[in-house]
């Protein structure tokens, strides 16, 4: 557990975060710009040191990183003793060292022995051909891959990411996202990931800290935070849910995965790249705008996925739009429909209806 | 017309003084410049002012105060005598102390602005990868500012070679101990030995010229290396008060 209690005043900006963050999987720190995300990350990293008289504390799995209370003097564990790695927007490679020496820099300063292997990391991040180059001669995406490799090779107990994709173009973003999805599963190193991008949040996060104007609004698992109609995420234009589950079978003829939702229900997910049934659980995203509601299951429809659900909550957004929360066994869906539809169909909480899902994105392994 | 043995002694002494002073200046000046580049301490302007003073003060003023500090009844000088068994006034050690103070701004100022141009996040990243402060200095800061460091060292070296006022006040004119080129030259002129003065003046001129040539050649190369950190385009040789 990362135990944080921060009460900082920086000019007119107040940052108040008192919470516990799980130290497995990916925890995203999410919020609009100037909500204090990076400030919080920098304090956790030790990059900015809070005022010595302010009451703050941070401990990581019972290792004290920062402490000040009325009984104890100020304590700040130096950055180099925290066993963290930090990946910024701009990669921040050491420009006087080749890629290989940048990676060696991390390996030479490990505080504990590790079986994270140089060649393995280079292969996974496809940087073998870059090793002799200087950072200035790399593209943005290449630099970021090297920065991530360097972070992993330092064998950290936590990796902090400060919007690592925001300086990249669309192709590079996609590639780095893919690497990040793979890496956090392979190494079991917790990630603390600052972003304001909902797409990145849905793809990577297991857990979310929601910040607004320096205040912690929510600290919940990704599934809960996306489907909580009282939180701003469900109200956004591209709101949606993610569903994780096991694959029952792979239909080779149509390139479809059959995702088990429990209780005899399933979803068909198109996967053009699959050759066989994946062994692991998968994560999918369903946008609220892609889910419509019918009172009876349409039998003659091009839509593959029509499943029985129960309405658990209805919230009117604005401009005649509404978000409806739907339960299917223990999975949740959101549906964005017009307020007029709700009135015409007479939708009420507790009603059994059918959800027609027009589009599902396969995000990767869960 | 050739250099006399006394002149050669003076040249060697000058080189020795410049070398020792430059070495000490790097040891003191680089950490000091790093501290100044990073600190937000309230005494920073005070320290910067003190370091810059030799740029505008006549060297004789510095020399005068050093002379007083070196007098045997002074606390500092008497302790020095106790620890090292030699007096500071009219000694090579005294000259080194004077040169270091006199040339300190020539190392600290360019290095401070060099260090200020290295993004803070670079060193923080090094720290997160496990580098402590000393490690950061040797593995990141020093290699990234290699050019500036060489230029600053050359400048300090050249500046120390040309020193006169401070030496005049605290060094006296003892051959082999404190008689540097500028003092020997002054002697020659005083005794109307213009031929010897010419040779010595020319030697100092040539040495200074090549020192500066090295600095500007480095500066030029630094500029052509567009992106690299620690380029020396800021280099300015200031007018000292002499």
Label each residue range with its predicted role.
Chain A
Residues 181, 185, 195-265:
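Internal alpha/beta loop-helix hairpins
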Residues 265-315, 332, 336-366:
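Glycine/charge-rich catalytic "coupling/switch" loops of P-loop NTPases
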Residues 64-85, 109:
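ABC ATPase NBD coupling module
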Residues 63-66, 113-130, 181-182:
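Conserved ABC ATPase "signature" region
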Residues 153-157:
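A short, proline-enriched helix->beta-strand linker immediately N-terminal to the Walker B motif
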Residues 159-163:
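Catalytic Walker B motif of ABC-type/P-loop ATPase nucleotide-binding domains
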């Amino acid at each position: 557990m990362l135990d944080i209690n921060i009460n900082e005043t920086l000019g007119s900006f107040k940052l108040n975060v008192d919470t516990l963050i799980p130290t497995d999987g990916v925890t995203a720190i999410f919020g609009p710009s100037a909500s204090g995300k990076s400030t919080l990350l920098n304090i956790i990293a030790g990059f900015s040191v809070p005022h010595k008289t302010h009451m703050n504390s941070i401990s990581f799995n019972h290792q004290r990183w920062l402490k000040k209370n009325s009984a104890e003097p100020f304590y700040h564990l130096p950055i180099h003793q925290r066993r963290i790695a930090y990946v910024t927007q701009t990669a921040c490679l050491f420009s006087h060292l080749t890629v290989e020496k940048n990676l060696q820099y991390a390996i030479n300063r490990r505080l504990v022995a590790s079986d994270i292997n140089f060649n393995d990391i280079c292969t996974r991040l496809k940087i073998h051909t870059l090793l002799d180059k200087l950072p200035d001669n790399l593209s943005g995406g290449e630099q970021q891959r090297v920065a991530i490799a360097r972070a992993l090779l330092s064998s950290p107990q936590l990796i902090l990411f400060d919007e690592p994709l925001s300086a990249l173009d669309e192709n590079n973003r996609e590639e780095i996202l893919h690497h990040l999805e793979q890496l956090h599963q392979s190494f079991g190193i917790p990630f603390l990931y600052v972003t304001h991008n909902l797409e990145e949040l849905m793809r990577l996060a297991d857990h979310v800290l929601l910040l607004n104007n320096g205040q912690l609004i929510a600290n919940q698992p990704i599934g809960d935070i996306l489907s909580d109609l009282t939180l701003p995420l469900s109200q956004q234009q591209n709101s949606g849910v993610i569903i994780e589950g096991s694959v029952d079978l792979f239909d080779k003829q149509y390139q479809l995965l059959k995702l088990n939702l429990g209780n005899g229900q399933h979803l068909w997910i198109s996967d053009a790249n699959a050759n066989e049934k994946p062994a692991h659980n998968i994560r999918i995203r369903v946008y609220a705008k892609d889910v419509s509601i019918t009172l009876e299951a349409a039998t003659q429809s091009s839509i593959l996925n029509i499943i029985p659900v129960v309405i658990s909550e209805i919230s009117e957004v604005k401009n005649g739009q509404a978000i409806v929360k739907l339960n299917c066994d223990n999975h949740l869906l959101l549906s964005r429909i017009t307020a007029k539809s709700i009135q015409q169909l007479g939708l009420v909480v507790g009603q059994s209806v059918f959800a027609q899902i027009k589009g599902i994105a396969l995000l990767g392994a869960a | 017309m050739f250099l006399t043995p006394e002149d050669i002694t003076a040249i060697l002494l000058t080189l020795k003084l410049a070398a020792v002073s430059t070495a000490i200046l790097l040891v003191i000046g680089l950490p000091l410049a790093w501290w100044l580049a990073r600190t937000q301490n309230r005494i920073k302007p005070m320290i910067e002012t003190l370091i810059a003073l030799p740029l505008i003060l006549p060297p004789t003023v510095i020399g005068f105060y050093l002379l007083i500090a070196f007098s045997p009844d002074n606390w500092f000088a008497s302790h020095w005598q106790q620890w090292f068994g030699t007096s500071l006034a009219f000694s090579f050690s005294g000259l080194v102390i004077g040169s270091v103070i006199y040339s300190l701004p020539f190392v600290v100022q360019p290095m401070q602005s060099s260090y200020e141009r290295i993004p803070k996040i670079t060193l923080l990243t090094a720290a997160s990868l496990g580098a402590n402060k000393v490690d950061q200095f040797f593995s990141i800061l020093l290699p990234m500012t290699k050019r500036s460091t060489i230029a600053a060292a050359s400048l300090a070296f050249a500046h120390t070679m040309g020193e006169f006022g401070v030496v005049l006040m605290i060094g006296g004119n003892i051959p082999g101990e404190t008689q540097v080129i500028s003092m020997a030259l002054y002697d020659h002129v005083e005794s109307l030995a213009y031929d010897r003065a010419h040779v010595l003046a020319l030697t100092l001129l040539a040495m200074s010229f090549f020192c500066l040539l090295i600095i500007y050649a480095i500066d030029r190369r630094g500029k052509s290396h567009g992106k690299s950190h620690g380029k020396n385009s800021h280099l300015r040789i200031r007018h000292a008060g002499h």
